[in-house]
A protein has these predicted regions:
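Helix-turn-helix
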Residues: 7-41
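Short, structured helix-loop boundary elements
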Residues: 18, 40, 67, 71, ...
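Amphipathic alpha-helical packing segments from all-alpha helical-bundle domains
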Residues: 56, 72-87, 102-128, 136-140, ...
């Protein structure tokens, strides 16, 4: 999966082939097919790993610098995602897999929804702050918008375009403004 992530970092996930993964890994194509039946399986596996890593960074960030407010938790979440964009090869291309349009959809919940769930659970467990259905939708919307803007911010730069990172924070805050919790 490291070879796939590195290749995606350079070329994007659309151009990724199993042959490229094998070449980058210094392995035969048969070795790749032993673990992954096709290119889609490679993409799904990398997306799953990306989600696991993003959730780990997010949970640690919320634990270490979490906030007692929804807005503060979103700020921490965007910073955590920026860290993952900067440190995980290929993350800027595939992110947590929500960009993949593979039918039928394997799960009703996407990666961004899982990120929103972690934020909600942190607020509920650590702060006793219960979010109603409107607030939960607002958090998911904030994460979807932040993901889209961060994807643009890191499209051409490993460090990210600071104006788009700031915009991701600003717009995610707008998504939850006025939400009662």
């Amino acid at each position: 999966m490291d070879a796939a992530s590195e290749t995606m970092h350079d070329l994007g996930y659309e151009q990724l082939t199993t042959a490229m993964v094998a070449d980058r890994a210094g392995a035969s194509i048969g070795t790749v097919y032993r673990y992954f039946p096709d290119r889609i399986a490679v993409l799904q596996s990398v997306a799953s790993r990306n989600l696991d890593r993003a959730l780990n960074v997010l949970k640690a960030s919320l634990r270490d610098g979490g906030s007692s407010t929804l807005e503060g938790s979103l700020d921490v979440a965007v910073d955590a995602l920026v860290e993952v964009f900067r440190t995980e090869k290929g993350f800027r291309s595939l992110r947590v897999g929500d960009v993949l349009d593979i039918r039928p959809v394997a799960s009703a919940r996407g990666g961004n929804a899982e990120i929103a769930r972690v934020i909600r659970e942190d607020l509920e467990q650590r702060q006793g702050l219960l979010l109603d259905s409107n607030a939960r939708l607002a958090v998911e919307t904030a994460i979807d918008v932040a993901d889209a803007l961060l994807g643009r911010a890191f499209l051409h730069s490993d460090r990210g375009e600071t104006s788009l990172i700031a915009e991701a924070k600003r717009v995610s805050m707008l998504a939850v403004s006025g939400v009662t919790h």
